[in-house]
């Protein structure tokens, strides 16, 4: 079913890869409820909804597309929903109405995924931009690891600066990073997961990891279904004029997922002649998960860049994603345990930093000799970590690419879809 021999992998390797991916991204089941609480959504509601959406999307990715990519509600759009859509409306838009907008975007997303458009879009992206996306995601994910661990910290004059290297959390991260790097240098199977497990044990014995709330609890949805009638959802969007909100959800989700899929697939060696096999099935995963998640009460889902950690651990097939889905299902009954582990950034940050370094390898495939090819890709690489947004990096690449190509007199090399989305990105960034 998963073609393990064809991908030169094994059940053990895929399970270890799935566990690695899960533990690097499980923070979302705690962080997402905290962020959406600012919109008034009950914590337990979002906790359970986040897991349900993640299971649906990741299972689809595993069984239909056979990709080692996990799906979950994305960071960024959850904050956009909580602060820009709900809180900024001063009571004019409830969180239930906001989820109607998410649901509508999800349905439109499914329709787009069923058409050839998204597949054509992936194939239309110039090779240099594809390599730039992979490299930019690598820098972004490494920066996330450094920031979460406290190795770099916010600074008023320089934006970021070196963190407190005497902090127990930072020291633990550096120890975990050293363990993981040494294991990878020695080509130890499951190096990243072993490094995470070793760091967790050190955290426990040094008093940084506590299980004061126990290990298990029963899941529940205190408000039931957020959207019981899909037709009401569309009506809410029309009544409140949430067209710009739906457009933002749709555009950002499309390119967050597309960018992550390209980056992870490139890293895993799944791209065939710069094309993704089973791409339509893969693209349906996040759109379906977004729609289901909105019904229960969570923000739009996306392909998680932390999937690259599982790929670095050897994940090559949907068995990796299936393992992640099973772990998400189990986490529904172990919220205190999950909360405790995800609260220690030092456990997962080393894996993110190492994966970032591995993804940087794509920079060697880029054409740096032609300015009209190099500069748009450079903007993608630069913008992703500096704006903390994959879609913004892609947007700047898309907007600049037609401009520099036309200036060079190479307008015939510009795919029409690149021009269309360059215009859409310009509208989203500078007008909406």
Curated annotation (Swiss-Prot):
One of its GO terms (cellular component) is plasma membrane. It is found in: Cell membrane. The chain crosses the membrane at residues 15-35, 51-71, 92-112, 133-153, 174-194, 196-216, 234-254, 340-360, 379-399, 412-432. InterPro entries: Azg-like (IPR045018), Azg-like_bact_archaea (IPR026033), NCS2 (IPR006043). Induction: Expression is regulated by the purR regulon. Down-regulated by adenine and up-regulated by guanosine. GO terms for molecular function: purine nucleobase transmembrane transporter activity. It is a multi-pass membrane protein. Keywords: Cell membrane, Membrane, Transmembrane, Transmembrane helix, Transport. Pfam families: Xan_ur_permease. Belongs to the nucleobase:cation symporter-2 (NCS2) (TC 2.A.40) family. Azg-like subfamily. Involved in the uptake of the purine bases hypoxanthine and guanine. May work at purine concentrations higher than 100 uM. PANTHER family: XANTHINE/URACIL PERMEASE C887.17-RELATED, XANTHINE_URACIL PERMEASE C887.17-RELATED. This is Guanine/hypoxanthine permease PbuO. It comes from Bacillus subtilis (strain 168).
